[in-house]
Amino acid sequence: MIPDPKIFYQTYLKDYHGTKATYLKKILDDLPKYEKEIFDKELDEEEKDQFRLTLKSDLRQTYFHAIETFFELFFALNPHGKQKFDDLNVLYNLANSAGPETYNKISKIALNENSLEFLDEKIKFSEFDISIGHYLFYMGIFKAATMSKELQDEIDKSIDAIKYGLKILATDFINREEYNAYKHGLRIIPAVKAFMLGDVKTNEIKIKWDLSDSMSFYLKSKSPNEVKIITKLSDISRDYSMTMFCSRLIYHLIFYRRLTLKFEKDAEKYKKFPITFFGKEPIAKCNKVNVAIQDLEYTMTLTESDLEIQSTVNDKT
């Protein structure tokens, strides 16, 4: 049986990522309380560190997953270059989405300055002339009887801010190595505790950064004898704020479409509902970096002795 695609909008977990980010942040903000409640025992220092880093890593993954989810929905519903509106084909489009194609579209948004200008293009929807951005993020809010110039101006400014925010999300997402290190088997470890710069002659430490809240993952290098290591310092505040922003975008794609379908159970509940708007300044605040070092990248060259050890280990396995 093929379910009615309209049910998708009524039942979709539109707050999934926001809810997850909220409880992860709440636990991180009061770790001693939740350590006792969850584990029902006193954790030693290593266990506490593992718990804390697990939560931070989960928040980071949630951010990446929110971006991926948003763009899948965004492309599934986007009418640009199509001869039809796909609101009721959303399940088919999502099921037939191709990962590499989606990634390429996201990359174009990140790297092409004018990649989102199509959101300002006008389309004819029913009897209304609206922008594609209006259609995507404010579906149903375009009836002449309810649209004032002030409201239209607010929607236009909001769409302009959304374009600004989408560039940030796309840029964060296209560097896939970190997400894949979580997604395709856990290949990320808290290996680096500090980064220091010192005087070669005196061995005196001049600068030291605490990296105890960092996670490291390994990448292939062009040389078979090299290993590239990327270390990223956890930025809980940014991960949380950007996840909430992305979650709100998902909410806009789903919620306003749900209202246009006029489900009986919604008639009383949503007689009145708030219309929310995005702004560049609040998005920039979400995007603020709160750590001294974001990315630390270095390459290790394996020596002949390293390769001999590696060969010996491989022979024994």
Regions found by a protein language model. Give the residues of each.
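Short, solvent-exposed secondary-structure capping/transition elements
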Residues: 69-87, 188-193
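Alpha-helical protein-protein interaction scaffolds
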Residues: 59, 63-65, 72
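Acidic, Ser/Thr/Gly/Pro-rich intrinsically disordered interaction regions
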Residues: 1-61, 109-317
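Hydrophobic/aromatic-rich structural module bridging two neighboring secondary-structure elements via a short loop
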Residues: 83-118
